[in-house]
UniProtKB/Swiss-Prot annotation:
GO biological process: tRNA modification
GO molecular function: oxidoreductase activity, acting on paired donors, with incorporation or reduction of molecular oxygen
Family: Belongs to the TrhO family.
SUPFAM superfamilies: Rhodanese/Cell cycle control phosphatase
Keyword Oxidoreductase tagged: yes
PROSITE patterns (alphabetical): RHODANESE_3
Residue numbers annotated as active site: 182 (cysteine persulfide intermediate)
Domain Rhodanese: 128-222
Keyword field contains Aminoacyl-tRNA synthetase: no
Listed name of the protein: tRNA uridine(34) hydroxylase
Alphabetical UniProt keywords: Oxidoreductase, tRNA processing
EC number in record: 1.14.-.-
Biological source species: Ralstonia nicotianae (strain ATCC BAA-1114 / GMI1000) (Ralstonia solanacearum)
Length: 282
């Protein structure tokens, strides 16, 4: 059976999280769905996988709630269930930035459709003639799997490191158009709002993130694959599982070439583990 994988989020005030959680959990369990759903005062973040009928059912159930009526999941397919279990969790934020005054529901940075971004990158500037800078808001290990050509990234280890990183480099973007991007849109949405608040003037977020870009325009101007937080590890431009795997011991991303190493034993260790051990021994 082919598995349908969806990711979706929405920034919307949720004051009934304590009652919404058990109801949503029961609906997911009844449909044998696996994955993770986060509920926070600022909204919902969804990663679920299951049969077509089950996915359509849970999306329909959510959209029956007026707050989620415009929920727009991004889909991909896989031959196997990429999640081991189902979690519906209550969190302080659906993506942790630790800047509580940033409330995307109250106003967001302009979103840029993938087709428009491709056109800007094709022509080398935006419609006003400004240089376009692609800003990767993801963690360094995600960037290593693939990113937009010539994108700026800061090698952050977690999203809470983004605000100080962008503050230190704010002047680099004077007179330029900045397009923030991430996997599915949630991090770059918060990042774009933050950049506006610190005074950057020409800021956009890539609508739907890398996955939406792949879906609508393919891999033009993008090198590599897109890291995803499930057992598929990475998706290619066709939204199919790609070659990289994640080591379950050290969490490093293992390339197809590294998987040929004698140090790679699936589920146990990888060449990065061996490197860590060698450095620890010196």
């Amino acid at each position: 059976m082919q598995i349908v994988n969806i990711s979706a989020y929405k920034f919307v005030t949720l004051n009934d999280r304590e009652t919404l959680r058990p109801a949503l959990l029961a609906e997911c369990q009844a449909r044998d769905l696996k994955g993770t759903v986060l509920l926070a005062p600022e909204g919902i973040n969804i990663f679920l996988a299951g049969s077509r009928e089950a996915i359509d059912g849970i999306v329909g159930w959510l959209r029956a709630d007026a707050r989620f009526a415009d929920l727009a999941p991004k889909e991909s397919l896989s031959d196997h269930q990429p999640f081991r279990r189902l979690l519906v969790r209550l969190k302080k934020e659906i993506i942790t930035m630790r800047y509580p005054l940033i409330r995307p529901e109250d106003g967001r940075a302009p979103s840029l459709p993938p087709a428009t971004l491709k056109r800007w990158l094709d022509q080398g500037h935006d419609d006003d003639g400004r240089e376009v800078v692609m800003l990767d808001t993801r963690n360094g290990f995600e960037v290593a799997v693939g990113t937009f050509r010539d994108a700026v990234e800061y090698g952050i280890r977690k999203f809470t490191e983004f605000p100080p990183a962008i503050a230190a480099h704010k002047d680099d973007f004077a007179g330029k158009t900045v397009v923030s991007f991430c996997t599915g849109g949630i991090r770059c949405e918060k990042a774009a709002i933050h950049m506006q608040e610190i005074g950057l003037q020409h800021v956009y977020q890539l609508e739907g993130g890398i996955l939406k870009y792949f879906e609508e325009v393919g891999a033009d101007h993008y090198d590599g694959d897109c890291f995803v937080f499930d057992h598929r590890t990475a998706l290619n431009a066709e939204l199919l599982p790609a070659g990289p795997k994640q080591c379950f011991a050290c969490r490093a991303v293992v390339t197809p070439e590294e998987q040929q190493s004698a140090d790679y034993i699936p589920g146990q260790r990888c060449p990065h583990c061996a490197d860590h051990q060698a450095r620890a021994a010196t």
